[in-house]
Amino acid sequence: LLLDLLRLGAYQLLYMDGVPSYAAVSQTVQQVRSLAGKGGAPLANGVLRSLEREGGDLDRFPPFETSPLEHLTTWGSHPPWLLRRWLGRWSPDQVRSLVELNNAPAPVYFRPLGVEPGEARDRLREMGWEASLLGDGIPCLLLGSGTDPALLLQEVPGIVQDPGAALVTLYAHPEAGIRLADLCAAPGGKALALAHQGAYVLAADPSLPRLRVLRENVERVGGRVWVVAARAQEPPVGECPMVLLDVPCSGTGTLRRHPDARWRLTPETLRELVDLQERILEGAAPLVPAGGHLVYATCTLEEEENEGQVRTFLARHPEFHLKETGAVPARYLDEMKRLRVLPQETGFDGAFAARLERGS
């Protein structure tokens, strides 16, 4: 705790021009005294006073041009093992863009449901809120800074949803009136959106608190969504013409929304997630009839959770094949017509999806 408080104080001294140095030092020392014990207060005062006098030598960061890994580890505050993976796939400049985005405040997007985005934007502007259309047929609005989503949700039916997640539902492209099982549903944004795209959705998840939030959202915005408490490995449904698996994943495409996640993730937990995803896929495959679709989705950037997982599944299940619908612009698709949204290219949260059709 003492180290964390010192880090916060140092950050205020070095990077927050709006906080006077004396205030950063005194407030941090007070917090140390009240939260970490009186004994730590003199140490905190001495460390921060020294930092105030000497300043932080930002030139001590390894140069990006010659040492991108070391630079991005220190300056960008990302774990080296994760950066090594990214530098093995993308250029140093692309990885730096991703790191910068992960460290920046996340924008807030609103997806109106039952109301066209243009109409929702006009209504919000009439109420004094700033909102902008995105283009590319993405049904989300970018909200201006300072907009309170909680107040907005009381005025216009919809959900807070990043365009990356919205593109997953567009890519799934359910036919009107189709029965769809969302087996990893909570907190339910995709289930609600798919219902408003015309599907009859069975939303299953083992988390009761998160399902309560989903039920409240269904009551608020409407939609043909039936909520069930169940594990994806034990599907609460028989044969279903469309199954969505928005599986638990490492979430490396959404690190800007969860700043601590980069430090909690380890290679071991990544391997455990890959095993879990494989089990969920295997459990869901028998539910899909001939001509039906299995949509596998994540919010991670990691190859073994995305392309690798789909490749392994198709090798075991030759009765399935990739089936793209043309429902999203080509710029969001990879060479195999799978959905791939990269934050460093789009500014959106990362997303991946593959639409798999069972042959007749």
Which residues does each predicted region cover?
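S-adenosylmethionine
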Residues: 1-360
